[in-house]
Amino acid sequence: MRILLRMKLHKLQKWENYLASVEKMDYKTFAPLEQGSDAELTETTAENLFVQISLYATLLEKYDLKKCAGDGTDFEKTVRIMQWLTDNTFYSGAAFKWNADNPLDILEYAYGQDFSHAICCRDKSVVFTDCLMALQIFAYPICLLSTNSGCHFVTHVYCRELQKWVLFDPSFNCWFTKDGKLLSVWELKTLYLNNDEPVLENYSFNHTDRCKEIYLAGFIKQNLTNLSTWHDNSMDRRGYKRNDWESKKEFKTKLPDFKMM
């Protein structure tokens, strides 16, 4: 079985094969969205989540992030950083390599490489979050989890000019609005629970507009049932021991709604 799985994953390292696999996803397998519960999750503080860790200085210098972000609002800078990440790395839900939760390691593997070095949604979210934090834009990664173990990672970003959290998906270079209003993950979930639909903004699946409906149903809507983040952005558990998922950072913490300055 393990050999067969590796053969399948190897086949999916080609973009056309991975794209075809996403296009063939069966809507019937998607779980219904539920209210979910965070009762078993721990809580955290702003002091835990938003530490200026030492590797941020390296990120800023090595990738010239201030130039990439440019001037403007937190939203404008966030969009530019997300576009930079999209332009320089590929996304794949069948990524062949598991990386440490360390943006320098992830970018060393994926930056400027072809699709065979694509990274998963967790890696995209971690890099995106840390790049924003290096620029002193408050952000944290979110694990979205359905009732049937479907999973996707996105990022919450605090836009100070709006005084609110806004949801971004760096794997698909997009965000969500309703009536022109930028949505948080909580607002997006409530919208779907009320049988309403968001507007998908700026969507890009590795520089194509393919699979939008599958993305909304299979990557986003079904996975909004359970929401969690990491307890802190410290260097603790940012290493990765081969074939040991437990060595990575845990996502067992409630999403905070801090008002940042």
What are these regions (language model features)?
Residues 23-116:
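Secondary-structure boundary elements
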Residues 1-23, 77:
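Membrane-proximal basic amphipathic "stem/tether" segments
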Residues 74, 117, 121, 209:
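Aromatic-acidic/polar surface patches that form glycan- and anion
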Residues 157-261:
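His-Asp-centered catalytic microenvironments across diverse enzyme cores
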Residues 88-91, 145-149, 172-176:
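Solvent-exposed loop/turn segments at secondary-structure junctions
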Residues 94-154:
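Active-site neighborhood of thiol-dependent amide/isopeptide-bond enzymes
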Residues 74-79, 87, 133-139, 161-165:
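Loop/turn elements at helix/coil->beta-strand transitions in domains of secreted/extracellular proteins
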